[in-house]
C-alpha cells in the first residue's frame, strides 16, 4: 500500500482515507479530499464524510469492537486494510495481522509494527471500513511536481551534467588501466607522464562542466519549482493558513531543496556509476573471463543482502522526516505562546514536551544509524572476504600464466567499484521513494488557486455592497444565508455580536479573504492598493519605524507632516520624537522593543497612511488602555481629516459604538445594520450592549 503522510494533525483521517482509496486503485491526494478551503472547525463530521464518500463512490461503515479479543480475532484478512482510531485522537491504517505482530501505517510517521500487547493499548476500539460501490472507478494521478521536473531536467544542462559524470567515470577507469600498464612496463616513462597529465586535464574539464550544469539547473529549478511553490502558497485562501501551522508550511517549503539535491547529487551520479560498471565488466572480461565471472557472482550475493535493507531504511527515513516536522510544529506552537508559558511557569512542561518529541526524532534517526552501521560493517566484511578470495583464486590462475599480478590489482579495484555501484543503486531506490513522499507532501503547493476577481463599480457612492451573500463551513449548514446591505464611502462601521456569532467570518467576507455565495461589489478602483488592514495576528517587521508604517519610504517623496499628523492622532508622535532617530529609529523583529499597545497604534497609523481609502480593523484596540482608545475615537473616527476613508472594524469595546456612523449587529445568524441609537430599540441588541 502506498504511504500517504498527513499535512497536520487535523487531516490524519483524510490521509488514511487517501491510502485506502489508493489501495482500491483510485489515487487521490489529501488536498483533493478537502471540501472547500479547510476542514470544518468541528472536525470531520458525518455529513462531511458522507460527501466525500459520495464523491469517490465508496461505502463507509463504523464498528465498535470488544477490546478483550486479540487482533487476529478482531481483524480477519479479507476486511483489511481498515482504518482504526488510535490513542483516542488519531487514525491509522491496519494492513497486516501476523501471529504476534500487527503492521499498520501511521500517517504521522509511516509503516510500523506492534506486538499484540502494545497494539491493544493504543487501539481505541473503533474500526472504519471502506468498500467500493458498483459505480467506483479507478483513477491514476500524476503528481503535480512531475511536469515541472521534466522541464527542468530534460534539457542541455542535464546532458552536460551526465556527460561530465561519464567523463569522470571514464577517467577513473583510465587511471586503473594506466596503473596496470605501468606495473606491466608496457610503456616508457614519457608516455605514462603524458597519460597522467591527460587524466588531470579531463578530470578538470569534467569538474567545470559539472559545476556549470549544476548552477544553470539550480537557476532553472528556482524559477520553475521554488517560484511556483511561493506563488501557490500565497494563492491559498486565508483559511489554509489557519489549518496549517507556520512550522508545517516552512518544513514543506524546505522539502523542495531535498528534491533537487536528491536528483542532482544522488540519483543521476548513482545511475551513471551503475551503468559504467557494465563497461568495466566488459573490460575485465577481456583480461580474465573466469575472474570476472567470480566477481559478478560475489556481487550478486552482496546485492541480494543489501537490497533487503532498503525497505527498512526507507521506512526509518519516513519516520525521521515526519518526526522532525512534528517536533518543529510543537516548538513553533509553544514559542507562539511564550508569554502565557512564562506567566504560568509552564517551562518544565514545555521542556518535558520538547524532550519527548526530540527523543522520538532521535529514536528514528538512531534506527537509520543502526541500518547504516549494519550496512557499513557488511560492506567492509564483504570487501575483505572478496579480496582475499580473489587473491587466492588469482594466484592460482597466475601460476598457470592466465593472469598477471597487475591484473589482480585491477580486479581488486573492480571489487570496490562493484560494491559502490550496488550501494548507489540502493541509494537511488531509497531516494526515489523519499522524493516521492516529498513530492506528494508539497504537491498541493504547486497548484496555484484561482483568485476571485473583485467586482468593481468605481463611480458608486457605496464603498461596498453585499447581495444575497451566504456562507457555510459545511453543505447546507449556513452561518449566513442571503444577507444584503451596503456601506457608503466614508462611513465608520463597527461589527459587534457575541463570541462565535460570525463577526470574523463577515469581516473576512467583506475583505474578500474567504469564498462565499453571492455577490460583493466594491466602489473603489485599484481596490487592493488602497486597503489598510489591522488584524489580530499582525506585527511589525525588523527595520526602521518609517519602513513599517509607510509603503514607499523614499525620502524625497515622504510627506513628513502627514505622517506626524497621523502619529499624533493615534497618540504616538511624542514617543516617536523621543527616539534617537525619531521615525528612522530601528525596530527589533516583531517590534519587540515596543509594548503591545505601541505596536497596535503604529499598525493603526499604517492603515491610515499610504493613500488607503478602505480600512479594516479586527480588534484594533485590544491592547490599548481607555485613554489611548478614547484618543483614537475622537482623533480618528470623529476627525474630518479622515471623512473620506471608510473604516470597518470588529471590536469588543462597546464604547466605540457612540463614535461610529452605523453598527452591524450579528445575532443567531441574522444581521442587523443601523445607527446605534436605533438598534437600542431592539431587545436583543439592547440586552447585548447593556450586559
From Swiss-Prot:
Entry keyword annotation includes Zinc: no
Locations listed in the record: Cell membrane
Family: Belongs to the ABC transporter superfamily.
Membrane topology value: Multi-pass membrane protein
EC number(s) given by UniProt: 3.4.22.-, 7.-.-.-
Domain Peptidase C39: 6-130
Residues annotated as binding ATP: 497-504
Annotated ranges, domain ABC transporter: 464-689
A GO MF term: cysteine-type peptidase activity
GO CC, alphabetical: plasma membrane
Domain (ABC transmembrane type-1): residue spans on this chain: 158-434
Transmembrane segments: 159-179, 189-209, 262-284, 289-311, 385-405
One Pfam assignment: Peptidase_C39
Family annotation (PROSITE patterns): ABC_TM1F (PS50929), ABC_TRANSPORTER_1 (PS00211), ABC_TRANSPORTER_2 (PS50893), PEPTIDASE_C39 (PS50990)
GO biological process: bacteriocin transport; protein transport; proteolysis
Protein name as it appears in the record: Lacticin-481/lactococcin-DR transport/processing ATP-binding protein lcnDR3
PANTHER family, sorted: ATP-BINDING CASSETTE SUB-FAMILY B (PTHR24221), ATP-BINDING CASSETTE SUB-FAMILY B MEMBER 6 (PTHR24221:SF654)
Superkingdom classification of source: Bacteria
Keyword Protein transport listed: yes
Secretion signal, residue range per the UniProt entry: none
Cited function: Probably implicated in the export process of the lantibiotic lacticin-481/lactococcin-DR.
Sorted UniProt keywords: ATP-binding, Bacteriocin transport, Cell membrane, Hydrolase, Membrane, Nucleotide-binding, Protease, Protein transport, Thiol protease, Translocase, Transmembrane, Transmembrane helix, Transport
InterPro entries documented for this protein: AAA+_ATPase, ABC1_TM_dom, ABC1_TM_sf, ABC_transporter-like_ATP-bd, ABC_transporter-like_CS, Lacticin_481_peptidase, P-loop_NTPase, Peptidase_C39
Catalytic residues (UniProt): 12
Source species of the chain: Lactococcus lactis subsp. lactis
Amino acid at each position: 500500500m502506498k504511504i500517504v503522510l498527513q499535512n497536520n494533525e487535523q487531516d490524519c483521517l483524510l490521509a488514511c482515507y487517501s491510502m485506502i482509496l489508493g489501495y482500491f486503485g483510485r489515487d487521490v491526494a489529501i488536498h483533493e479530499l478537502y471540501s472547500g478551503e479547510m476542514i470544518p472547525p468541528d472536525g470531520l463530521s458525518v455529513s462531511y464524510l458522507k460527501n466525500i464518500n459520495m464523491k469517490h463512490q465508496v461505502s463507509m461503515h463504523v464498528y465498535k469492537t470488544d477490546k478483550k479479543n486479540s487482533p487476529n480475532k478482531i481483524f480477519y484478512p479479507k476486511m483489511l486494510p481498515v482504518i482504526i482510531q488510535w490513542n483516542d485522537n488519531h487514525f491509522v491504517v491496519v494492513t497486516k495481522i501476523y501471529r504476534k505482530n500487527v503492521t499498520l501505517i501511521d500517517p504521522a510517521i509511516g509503516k510500523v509494527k506492534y506486538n499484540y500487547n502494545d497494539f491493544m493499548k493504543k487501539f481505541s476500539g473503533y474500526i472504519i471500513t471502506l468498500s467500493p460501490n458498483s459505480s467506483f472507478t479507478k483513477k491514476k494521478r500524476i503528481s503535480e511536481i512531475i511536469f515541472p521536473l521534466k522541464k527542468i531536467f530534460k534539457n542541455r544542462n542535464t546532458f552536460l551534467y551526465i556527460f561530465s559524470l561519464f567523463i569522470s567515470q571514464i577517467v577513473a577507469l583510465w587511471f586503473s588501466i594506466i596503473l596496470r600498464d605501468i606495473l606491466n612496463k608496457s610503456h616508457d616513462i614519457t608516455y605514462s607522464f603524458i597519460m597522467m597529465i591527460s587524466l588531470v586535464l579531463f578530470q578538470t574539464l569534467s569538474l567545470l562542466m559539472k559545476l556549470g550544469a549544476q548552477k544553470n539547473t539550480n537557476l532553472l529549478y528556482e524559477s520553475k519549482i521554488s517560484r511556483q511553490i511561493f506563488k501557490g502558497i500565497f494563492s491559498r485562501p486565508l483559511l489554509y493558513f489557519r489549518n496549517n501551522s507556520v512550522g508545517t508550511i516552512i518544513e514543506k517549503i524546505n522539502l523542495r531543496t531535498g528534491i533537487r539535491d536528491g536528483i542532482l547529487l544522488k540519483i543521476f551520479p548513482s545511475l551513471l556509476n551503475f551503468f559504467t560498471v557494465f563497461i568495466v565488466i566488459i573490460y575485465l572480461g577481456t583480461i580474465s573471463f573466469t575472474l570476472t565471472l567470480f566477481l559478478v557472482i560475489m556481487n550478486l550475493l552482496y546485492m541480494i543482502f543489501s537490497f533487503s535493507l532498503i525497505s527498512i531504511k526507507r521506512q526509518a527515513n519516513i519516520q525521521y522526516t515526519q518526526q522532525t516536522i512534528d517536533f518543529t510544529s510543537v516548538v513553533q506552537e509553544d514559542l507562539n505562546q511564550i508569554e502565557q508559558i512564562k506567566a504560568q511557569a509552564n517551562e518544565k512542561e514545555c521542556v518535558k514536551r520538547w524532550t519527548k518529541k526530540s527523543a522520538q526524532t532521535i529514536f528514528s534517526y538512531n534506527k537509520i544509524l543502526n541500518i547504516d552501521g549494519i550496512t557499513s560493517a557488511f560492506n567492509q566484511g564483504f570487501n575483505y572476504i572478496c579480496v582475499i578470495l580473489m587473491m587466492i583464486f588469482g594466484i592460482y590462475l597466475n601460476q598457470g600464466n592466465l593472469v598477471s599480478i597487475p591484473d589482480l590489482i585491477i580486479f581488486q579495484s573492480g571489487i570496490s567499484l562493484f560494491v559502490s555501484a550496488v550501494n548507489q543503486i540502493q541509494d537511488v531506490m531509497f531516494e526515489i521513494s523519499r522524493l516521492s513522499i516529498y513530492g506528494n507532501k508539497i504537491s498541493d503547493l504547486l497548484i496555484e488557486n484561482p483568485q476571485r476577481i473583485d467586482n468593481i463599480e468605481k463611480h458608486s457612492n457605496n464603498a461596498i455592497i453585499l447581495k444575497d451573500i451566504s456562507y457555510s463551513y459545511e453543505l447546507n449548514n449556513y452561518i449566513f444565508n442571503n444577507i444584503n446591505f451596503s456601506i457608503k464611502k466614508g462611513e465608520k462601521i463597527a461589527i459587534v455580536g457575541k463570541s462565535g456569532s460570525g463577526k470574523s467570518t463577515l469581516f473576512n467576507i467583506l475583505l474578500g479573504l474567504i469564498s462565499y455565495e453571492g455577490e460583493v461589489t466594491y466602489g473603489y478602483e485599484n481596490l487592493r492598493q488602497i486597503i489598510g488592514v489591522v488584524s489580530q495576528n499582525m506585527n511589525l517587521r525588523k527595520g526602521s519605524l518609517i519602513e513599517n508604517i509607510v509603503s514607499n519610504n523614499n525620502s524625497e517623496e515622504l510627506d513628513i507632516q502627514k505622517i506626524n499628523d497621523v502619529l499624533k492622532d493615534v497618540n504616538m508622535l511624542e514617543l516617536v520624537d523621543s527616539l534617537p532617530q525619531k521615525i528612522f529609529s530601528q525596530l527589533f523583529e516583531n517590534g519587540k522593543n515596543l509594548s503591545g499597545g505601541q505596536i497596535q497604534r503604529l499598525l493603526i497609523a499604517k492603515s491610515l497612511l499610504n493613500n488607503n481609502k478602505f480600512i479594516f480593523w479586527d480588534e484594533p484596540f485590544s491592547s490599548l488602555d481607555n485613554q489611548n482608545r478614547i484618543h483614537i475615537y475622537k482623533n480618528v473616527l470623529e476627525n474630518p481629516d479622515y471623512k473620506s476613508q471608510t473604516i470597518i472594524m470588529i471590536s469588543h469595546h462597546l464604547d466605540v459604538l457612540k463614535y461610529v456612523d452605523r453598527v452591524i449587529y450579528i445575532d443567531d445568524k441574522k444581521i442587523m445594520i443601523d445607527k446605534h441609537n436605533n438598534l437600542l430599540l431592539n431587545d436583543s441588541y439592547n440586552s447585548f450592549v447593556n450586559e
